[in-house]
Amino acid sequence: MKYEVKPSNQFKKDLKLAAKRGYKIELLTDVVKKLANGETLDPKYKDHPLSGNFGFYRECHIQPDWLLIYEIDGCELILYLTRTGTHSDLF
């Protein structure tokens, strides 16, 4: 199952900041490719749903303090990339 990837404007800004910080963007790209192909992420990524008002989003760890927040729309086959950054950036 292949999902169309749609990054939010905020995600694009977050990605520029991550690159400026020297993060290895290819690590994020690999995770996004797996998600877009409908693959289950390895346990090392600690993929889980968020709670509360953010319950329809999921979060995974690219690195221990580098997160990806995303949403999958299974009906329309869309992977929304919402945010990326550190815990302090996002929460």
Q: Whereabouts are the PLM-identified features?
A:
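Generic detector of short alpha-helix boundary/capping microenvironments
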Residues: K6, Q10, T40-P43
